[in-house]
Amino acid sequence: MQLVTASEMQKIDTYTVNTIGMPQDVLIERAALSVIDVIGAGHFNLEHILVLAGLGNNGADGVAITRLLYAQGFNVSLQFVGNVSRAKESVQRQLAIIEKYGLVRSEKSDFNEATLIIDAIFGTGLNNLLPEGLQKMIKAANHIEKTVIAIDTPTGIDATTGEVRGAALKAHTTVTFGYNKIGLTRRVGGYLSGNVIVKDIGLLTPPDFSFSDTEENHSTKDV
């Protein structure tokens, strides 16, 4: 199976949206539906689902996932990590939709009440240390050992190197899109990603694209 770096994944995303013409919202909906499939096929405690959403496309996926769960009657809460007014347009569009469903996002949620946490804070675009406040929140969540499903990559994991950017949310399952990421197969990233499930959401590679690595060259114990 082919592996990609964060920058290679960005090239694939850009090509699919800008050259092929696939709307970003279509990819977001497909990503969200694929996560719903994973949740439905797994043996997760769905009594109270908490979705933690960031301000970028990963957060937009999280909002769409929240909407789909809410529409199916699940007890789901949506909490943003960061100032929503600074969120990308993709997030704002998803928010406008979910508000019409009547769901009110939470300003602050109690991790202890959640039986399942959806990590949609940062995906493959993370290239800096996480803010100190977010690091503290992640460490608190890890301490109480809640079941976490990470969207694309666990927050805090460098998708290229597998290194931790200050702190990382430990996932039971990671649903990643298009292709697996090198950082989910090596170093700490391989351990913190849990069970990695790759979902096809319709991303296309440019004609001149070449994969930098394959999964056979890595393992989760690679240090």
Curated annotation (Swiss-Prot):
Gene Ontology cellular-component terms listed: P-body
Substrates-to-products reaction catalysed: (6R)-NADHX = (6S)-NADHX; (6R)-NADPHX = (6S)-NADPHX
EC number from the UniProt entry: 5.1.99.6
Enzyme superclass (EC): isomerase
Pfam families linked: YjeF_N
Entry's Gene Ontology molecular function annotations: metal ion binding; mRNA binding; NAD(P)HX epimerase activity; nucleotide binding
Keyword tags: Isomerase, Metal-binding, NAD, NADP, Nucleotide-binding, Potassium
InterPro entries xref list: YjeF_N_dom, YjeF_N_dom_sf
UniProt signal peptide: none
SUPFAM superfamilies on file: YjeF N-terminal domain-like (SSF64153)
Domain YjeF N-terminal: 9-209
Amino acids binding (6S)-NADPHX: 57-61, 123-129, 152
PROSITE patterns named among the record's database cross-references: YJEF_N
GO biological process, one term: deadenylation-independent decapping of nuclear-transcribed mRNA
Cofactor: K(+)
Cofactor: how and how many bound: Binds 1 potassium ion per subunit.
Residues annotated to bind K(+): 58, 119, 155
Family that this chain belongs to: Belongs to the NnrE/AIBP family.
PANTHER family per record: ENHANCER OF MRNA-DECAPPING PROTEIN 3
Task of the protein: Catalyzes the epimerization of the S- and R-forms of NAD(P)HX, a damaged form of NAD(P)H that is a result of enzymatic or heat-dependent hydration. This is a prerequisite for the S-specific NAD(P)H-hydrate dehydratase to allow the repair of both epimers of NAD(P)HX.
Listed name of the protein: NAD(P)H-hydrate epimerase
Organism expressing this protein natively: Leuconostoc gelidum subsp. gasicomitatum (strain DSM 15947 / CCUG 46042 / CECT 5767 / JCM 12535 / LMG 18811 / NBRC 113245 / TB1-10)
